[in-house]
């Protein structure tokens, strides 16, 4: 059984954001489990749908981009748009996960979680198990 300090379920904005933050803190024994691919929920948005909250390129002045998920990053810079579509935002999430070399297992569906004395035992669809001291879902 694979063992990690932290297991994150889901590679959307929250999952990629928390993984990037833990990576910034130097945590090495973590994994992100995603049942499809990074940003898949955003890829499913209707083509016409865009973020209401604009992305601003103000990181250079020390301000955060509310749509950014990793410190020092901005969808406005990466995508050259203030109001990204779901498809473009999914691309941003994949850029972040690739740039920071986040440990992601795509096509890994969680079917059961059991809490025990040593943390969480996570059963995945293929019948395998992963253990994590902490679980973020």
Which sequence ranges carry the predicted segments?
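Short, glycine/charged-enriched secondary-structure capping and boundary segments
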Residues: 22-23, 45-49, 119
């Amino acid at each position: 059984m694979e063992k990690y300090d932290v297991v994150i379920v889901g590679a959307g904005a929250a999952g990629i954001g928390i993984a990037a933050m833990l990576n910034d803190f130097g945590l090495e024994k973590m994994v992100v489990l995603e049942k499809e691919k990074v940003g898949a929920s955003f890829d499913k948005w209707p083509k016409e749908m865009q973020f209401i909250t604009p992305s601003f390129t103000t990181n250079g002045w020390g301000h955060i981009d509310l749509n950014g998920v990793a410190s020092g990053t901005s969808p406005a810079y990466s995508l050259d748009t203030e109001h990204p579509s779901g498809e473009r935002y999914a691309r941003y999430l994949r850029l972040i996960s690739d740039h920071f070399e986040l440990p992601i297992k795509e096509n890994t569906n969680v079917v059961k979680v059991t809490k025990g004395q040593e943390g969480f035992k996570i059963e995945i669809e293929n019948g395998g198990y992963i253990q994590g001291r902490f679980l973020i879902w």
